[in-house]
């Protein structure tokens, strides 16, 4: 394990009286360095060291003058990820990580191997306040937002641990990305930049449970990001229960925002639909889903056989039920996939490993 020096204040790029450079964009680095009397181009050099090469100290930045490195050491820090726990799937196609934060919180990330490359699923918040019924992340509520650097460190930490190239990122771990909008956008700008990992926007997926103002704000950025909407129900009555934010932003508003997003960005919208046994997986639900989506916008439906969450009473549907649901959608012309089951044996659903470790800690403390 390495020493951790993440941001200690929510929403602030300051560690004590020093700035965490991973919380800054290139423009922010330029302001920092020119304020030290350095030339503007030095910011690009620092950015490459930090966001692309994964440098953990300013001493590594050998193309910077020694006096500038000393000034950076005095005014700034480079946060470093600390792996608290790691679980590898039996098929070796997924690795679940639990990263520690300096305030004692922990966040989850998942490394996934696909035929087309390697992807990382990152968290944007410690916990979540959206309260989705089937999600383990929401069980403890929201603790705090992550800083841009804390999000970025999940990617760098996994890259360092696996030695693998990361070709795509999904913001689909613990938390609601659009509920932590500014940090999410800063992370995206850095990870897609030439000075960062240079991952194309089309290979970045932003997941949301349906925060309509956030979707509209993201559309105005005109970035070719993939928007993944956690739909999970074809009508307001059921969605009000499964995804409580629907009570504030019902399906009519959500669908309108999604149509506008597709129009503004030229990207089709992905609708995530977690199939919960006996809850939303029946024939009538599939037919309602067709009526909701067909012909409304360029879209794709991703069916997700739910991971069991005993605390929520969530059960996984049978393979036959999943296939029947899929065939109904396909018969009506919708583009459908069933998410490949990566990491079910490593608690890869949102919040499961974090909660399991926390419960273990509580038991140990009780015994002590």
Swiss-Prot record:
Keywords: 4Fe-4S, Cytoplasm, Disulfide bond, Iron, Iron-sulfur, Metal-binding, Methyltransferase, rRNA processing, S-adenosyl-L-methionine, Transferase, tRNA processing. Pfam families: Radical_SAM, RlmN_N. GO terms for molecular function: 4 iron, 4 sulfur cluster binding; metal ion binding; rRNA (adenine(2503)-C2-)-methyltransferase activity; rRNA binding; tRNA (adenine(37)-C2)-methyltransferase activity; tRNA binding. GO terms for biological process: rRNA base methylation; tRNA methylation. InterPro entries: Aldolase_TIM, Elp3/MiaA/NifB-like_rSAM, Methyltransferase_A, RlmN_N, RNA_MTrfase_RlmN, rRNA_lsu_MTrfase_RlmN/Cfr, rSAM. Disulfide bonds join 121-350. It is an enzyme of class 2 (transferase). Its main location: cytoplasm. [4Fe-4S] cluster binds at residues 128, 132, 135. Signal peptide: none annotated. Gene3D superfamilies: 1.10.150.530, Aldolase class I. Reaction proceeds by a ping-pong mechanism involving intermediate methylation of a conserved cysteine residue. HAMAP family: RNA_methyltr_RlmN (MF_01849). This is Probable dual-specificity RNA methyltransferase RlmN. It comes from Pelotomaculum thermopropionicum (strain DSM 13744 / JCM 10971 / SI). The lineage of its organism: Bacteria, Bacillati, Bacillota, Clostridia, Eubacteriales.
């Amino acid at each position: 394990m390495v020493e951790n020096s993440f941001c200690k204040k929510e929403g602030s790029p300051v560690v004590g009286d020093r700035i965490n450079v991973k919380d800054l964009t290139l423009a922010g680095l330029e302001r920092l360095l020119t304020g030290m009397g350095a030339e503007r181009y030095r910011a690009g050099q620092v950015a490459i060291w930090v966001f692309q090469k994964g440098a953990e100290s300013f001493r590594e930045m050998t193309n910077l003058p020694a006096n500038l490195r000393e000034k950076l050491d005095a005014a700034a820090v480079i946060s470093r990820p600390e792996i608290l726990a790691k679980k590898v799937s039996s098929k070796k196609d997924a690795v679940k990580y639990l990263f520690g934060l300096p305030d004692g919180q922990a966040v989850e990330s998942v490394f996934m191997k696909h035929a087309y490359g390697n992807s990382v699923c990152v968290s944007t918040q410690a916990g979540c306040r959206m309260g989705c019924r089937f999600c383990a992340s929401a069980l403890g509520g929201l603790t705090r937002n992550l800083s841009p650097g804390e999000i970025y460190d999940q990617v760098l930490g996994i890259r360092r641990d696996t030695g693998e190239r990361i070709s795509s990122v999904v913001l689909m771990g613990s938390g609601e990305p659009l509920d932590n909008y500014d940090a999410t956008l800063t992370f995206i700008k850095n990870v897609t930049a030439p000075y960062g990992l240079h991952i194309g926007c089309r290979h970045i997926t932003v997941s949301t449970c349906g925060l309509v103002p956030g979707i509209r704000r993201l559309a105005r950025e005109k970035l070719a990001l993939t928007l993944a909407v956690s739909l999970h129900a074809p009508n307001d009555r059921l969605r009000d229960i499964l995804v409580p934010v629907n009570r504030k932003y019902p399906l009519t508003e959500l669908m309108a925002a999604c149509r506008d997003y597709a129009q503004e960005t030229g990207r089709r919208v992905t609708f995530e639909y977690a199939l919960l046994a006996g809850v939303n997986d029946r024939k009538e639900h599939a037919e309602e889903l067709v009526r909701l989506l067909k012909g409304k916008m360029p879209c794709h439906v991703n069916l997700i056989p739910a991971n069991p969450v005993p605390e929520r009473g969530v059960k996984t549907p049978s393979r036959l039920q999943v296939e029947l649901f899929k065939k109904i959608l396909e018969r009506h012309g919708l583009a459908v996939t069933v998410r490949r089951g990566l990491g079910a044996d490593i608690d890869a659903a949102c919040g499961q490993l974090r909660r399991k470790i926390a419960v273990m800690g509580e038991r140990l403390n009780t015994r002590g």
